[in-house]
């Protein structure tokens, strides 16, 4: 059998995630979320990459907590994740710093038609993997400390650090939703 291979683009750097939809290809390339139009779906770009969001930090000493995990939600928003060691202040290009959304480990989403971004939850260390159940509820994993979480918009989850929440009105940070840990809780998490 003949194998078909096509290179859509090789003009991006730091690619951590790819998602197709809404007339093109979406690329998470920290510090930016890029969109390359492909309106007819022929796997040939219809234009240059467009920066849709920016402000995702790139930690120099920790290459596993980058913004990642693009996935279309059942609500038509594009969802993504960002690790704790790569905090940022995200927004559409040109957004002044005081109007940007801080993210320090958490889940965010972007609406492609309205061109708005929301940070839904903070406090996770290294979120990798998320999906929706049959009721449209979002669940995600965290590869350090607690590992199964139910996304509740506005939540600040308990993570390994004791840093303050981005939201000054948070009463208490939420624990994981799994019924067990993936380390011996009688010891420190890294032993």
Features from the language model and the residues they span:
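Beta-propeller domains with acidic blade repeats across secreted/periplasmic ectodomains
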Residues: 1-191
């Amino acid at each position: 059998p003949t194998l078909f291979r096509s290179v859509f683009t090789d003009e991006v750097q730091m690619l951590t995630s790819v998602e197709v939809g809404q007339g093109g290809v979406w690329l998470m390339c920290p510090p930016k979320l890029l969109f390359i139009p492909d309106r007819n779906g022929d796997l040939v770009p219809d234009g240059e990459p467009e920066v849709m969001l920016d402000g995702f930090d790139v930690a120099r000493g920790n290459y596993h907590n980058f913004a990642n995990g693009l996935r279309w939600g059942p609500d038509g928003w594009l969802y993504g994740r960002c690790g704790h060691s790569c905090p940022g202040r995200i927004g559409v290009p040109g957004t002044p710093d005081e109007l940007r959304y801080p993210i320090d480990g958490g889940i965010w989403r972007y609406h492609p038609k309205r061109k708005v971004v929301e940070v839904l939850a903070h406090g996770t260390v290294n979120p990798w993997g998320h999906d929706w159940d049959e009721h449209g509820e979002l669940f995600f994993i965290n590869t350090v400390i607690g590992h199964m979480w139910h996304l509740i918009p506005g939540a600040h989850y308990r993570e390994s650090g004791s840093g303050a929440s981005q939201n000054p009105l948070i009463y208490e940070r939420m624990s994981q939703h799994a019924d067990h840990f993936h380390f011996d809780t009688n010891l420190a998490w890294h032993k």
